[in-house]
Amino acid sequence: MSLPSPSDDARIAIIACGALSVDISMICEQQGWAVDIHPLPPLLHNRPEQIAPAVEGQIGTLASRYERIAIGYADCGTYGALDELCDRLGLIRLPGSHCYDVYAGADVIAELSAAEPGTYFLTDFLTAGFERLVWRELGLDRHPELLPDYFRHYTRVVWLASRRTPDLERAATRAAERIGLPLQVRDVGGLAADRAGAGKGAGAGAGKGAGAGKGAGAGAGAGAGAGAGAAAASGGLTAALAALVHPR
């Protein structure tokens, strides 16, 4: 499955986490970037050791079709496997350890976690799909008695709200009630702020060796993975994407 931009001559492919792909596609369309989005299943997050191999497999499929490929993932529990892949092939990924960093900024997540280590984060995607992505995946629909085992160390739910719609507010409230924890909402500006955010050329310091072009991976520059991936440590998803689409 791919989510093409309006342009018919896209020269850049972004292999993206399915949890981010709709937002990424929308931003690329708003910015007029000639980008095709190729999402991978969001439930790979439950098997993070499979993320890097899945990304590499997709790179092999797409390399001959695009001038450049970028990775629409943070580290996402791969413990450096995505950075190793990016370094080896000369690719750039999104900044941060996980998608919470992408939306809110690593400093904000660190601050919230330090203030209350037992913070359970939800993005809009997780909020909307909580029943399927969390409740059923953990087996709590079949074994609700396991709820204390899964969440005993959590003390609050923080929803990182990119779109604060009535439907999502209700979903976040329901999710917190299901877990039995108080809900706090942190508006991350997200897509509303991103619409007026970075355009071409944003995302300074995206790193050398920006892309594996046709033939995937020739000329990986120093620091192309971990250093480049950390290029847009704050500034919202648009700024992070600008660093992928228009690296310096």
Across the structure, where does each feature detected by a protein language model lie?
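Glycine-rich, highly charged phosphate/nucleotide-binding loops
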Residues: P48-T61
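A conserved mid-domain beta-alpha-beta active-site/ligand-binding segment of alpha/beta enzyme cores
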Residues: A114-E169
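Long, intrinsically disordered low-complexity tandem-repeat segments
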Residues: A198-A230
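C-terminal, charge/polar-rich interaction regions
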Residues: A161-G203, G227-R248
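A short beta-strand-loop structural module common to alpha/beta enzyme folds
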Residues: A34-I51, V185-G189
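Gly/Ser/Thr-rich loops at beta-strand to alpha-helix junctions
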Residues: I15-V22, L44-H45, G72-L82, Y100-D101, ...
